[in-house]
Amino acid sequence: MLIPRKVKHRKQHHPSLRGRAKGGTSVHFGEYGIQALESAYVTNRQIEAARIAMTRHIRRGGKVWINIFPDRPLTKKPAETRMGSGKGSPEWWVAPVKAGRVMFELAGVPEPVAKEALRRAIHKLPMKCKVVKREAGE
């Protein structure tokens, strides 16, 4: 699981998900990638499930890059608790992903295998995504 080793503050404000991503919107490392079409919080479990879905399909070949990291804690109060008495305890770690962000990249496998592996990974993510190919000039 992806979680930060050490954090300065245990609880944080929720980051805004409005607008489009400013950076990380093109494929840099691999040949193919998964680009978010909507904004959402992606948990560490969803990132791991997508990674496993990709690597199982490509078997031994290829290389996978994960361009997002869950560094923001989301808190939750226990069930049947009265309101007040402070903020809840941190429950899980999320990566705030804005629309347009390339989250995963893949290289070293044929195009049909890469597209199928990325399609399987998209099913594990909480937002609409598309498979993008590296452009010639990059």
From Swiss-Prot:
Cross-referenced CDD domains: Ribosomal_L16_L10e (cd01433)
The keyword rRNA-binding appears for this protein: yes
Region (Disordered) location: 1-22
A GO cellular component entry from the record: cytosolic large ribosomal subunit
Residue intervals passing through the bilayer: none
A GO BP annotation: translation
Keyword terms: Ribonucleoprotein, Ribosomal protein, RNA-binding, rRNA-binding, tRNA-binding
Extent of Basic residues compositional bias: 1-21
Pfam families in the cross-refs: Ribosomal_L16
GO molecular function: rRNA binding; structural constituent of ribosome; tRNA binding
Role noted for this protein: Binds 23S rRNA and is also seen to make contacts with the A and possibly P site tRNAs.
Family of this protein: Belongs to the universal ribosomal protein uL16 family.
NCBIfam families linked to this entry: rplP_bact
Complex formation: Part of the 50S ribosomal subunit.
This protein's name: Large ribosomal subunit protein uL16
